[in-house]
Amino acid sequence: MSMTDPIADLLVRIKNAAAVGKPTVKLPSSKIKVAIAQVLKDEGYITDLRVTATENNKSELEIVLKYFEGRPVIETLKRFSRSGLRQYRGKTELPKVLGGLGIAIISTSKGIMTDAQAREAGVGGEVLCFVA
């Protein structure tokens, strides 16, 4: 099956699983998906992530979702840059999500990082998504 936007697929799977209260999400793995999931883990939006090998030299990413008092920690998960319209921002134009309460995940020349980390590193890049 061909997938045109694997990042949007990752975000939708996390959003849908959280909406119905599932403890984990399993999906095909890629380097960018693992990097985005690692940022979510580092920022406290998910509990854990695991990459396991499956048959046919494929790998699977399993994300353990985080809940607080029965509600998902991730309330908003929105794709910003998309395959048809890439959104690049310079270091001075990086967005702040909910006045700093959320994060923007940025793909930079130094890797995938949050908007705050990109500002600190003095780099801009493609704004992948917003999380709050």
Swiss-Prot record:
PROSITE patterns: RIBOSOMAL_S8. The lineage of its organism: Bacteria, Pseudomonadati, Pseudomonadota, Gammaproteobacteria, Lysobacterales. The keyword Ribonucleoprotein applies. Belongs to the universal ribosomal protein uS8 family. Keywords: Ribonucleoprotein, Ribosomal protein, RNA-binding, rRNA-binding. This is Small ribosomal subunit protein uS8. One of its GO terms (biological process) is translation. The keyword Ribonucleoprotein applies. InterPro entries: Ribosomal_uS8 (IPR000630), Ribosomal_uS8_CS (IPR047863), Ribosomal_uS8_sf (IPR035987). HAMAP family: Ribosomal_uS8_B. Part of the 30S ribosomal subunit. Contacts proteins S5 and S12.
